[in-house]
């Protein structure tokens, strides 16, 4: 599945023309608050109203690893490819998005000791607004919802290994709260 996403991203990015103001790179500041999730998104314009996007998020951190009562993690690697429609003009004003997303995750110990790990794949729909700060700099605000299927294993705590549930199920959850710094070149 990862190879398919990487191939789709590569084909999408090389198929667009590379003139001025057609490329951007951004990072979502909200992701850093969620236990230090590193993230990047690249975007290429394919016309006046359409951009194609590829993004990745990685969080390898485990906090308080030596203390089972305090251990918490939001470990993940997430990859997405998608498209944005800009009613006015690319990288300016309102936008609507759709994307395919894959995530391998291990979360637990944050709000309770319950921990879940697994793989999730699905589609996301979102929208937002890009505020132009400078000719080459935007602040991008947005929100998206993600639905799909996940295979998972639930544990009683982050470090005990006691399985409480496992299986496969459909999900529909908030995906991304976006306050991103975007550089356009």
Language model regions located:
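Sec-dependent N-terminal signal peptides
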Residues: 4-16
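Residues that define the transmembrane beta-barrel architecture of outer-membrane proteins
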Residues: 21-23, 34-38, 73-79, 117-123, ...
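Extracytoplasmic loops and strand-loop junctions of Gram-negative outer membrane beta-barrel proteins
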Residues: 22-25, 64-66, 108-112, 160-166
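Gram-negative (and chloroplast) outer-membrane scaffold detector with strong preference
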Residues: 44-141, 180-183
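Predominantly the C-terminal beta-signal and adjacent terminal strand-loop region
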Residues: 134-185
């Amino acid at each position: 599945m990862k190879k398919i996403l990487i191939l789709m991203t590569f084909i999408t990015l090389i198929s667009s023309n590379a003139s001025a103001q057609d490329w951007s790179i951004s990072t979502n500041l909200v992701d850093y608050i969620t236990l230090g999730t590193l993230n990047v998104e690249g975007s290429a314009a394919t016309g006046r109203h359409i951009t194609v996007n590829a993004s990745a998020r990685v969080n390898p951190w485990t906090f308080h690893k030596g203390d089972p009562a305090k251990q918490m993690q939001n470990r993940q690697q997430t990859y997405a490819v998608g498209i944005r429609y800009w009613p006015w003009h690319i990288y300016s004003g309102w936008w609507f998005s759709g994307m395919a997303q894959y995530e391998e995750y291990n979360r637990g110990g944050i709000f309770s000791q319950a921990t879940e790990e697994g793989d999730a794949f699905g589609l996301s729909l979102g929208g937002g607004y890009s505020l132009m700060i400078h000719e080459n700099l935007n602040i991008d605000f947005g929100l998206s919802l993600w639905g799909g299927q996940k295979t998972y294993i639930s544990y009683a705590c982050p470090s005990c290994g006691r399985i409480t549930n496992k299986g496969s199920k459909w999900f529909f959850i908030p995906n991304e709260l976006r306050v991103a710094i975007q550089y356009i070149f």
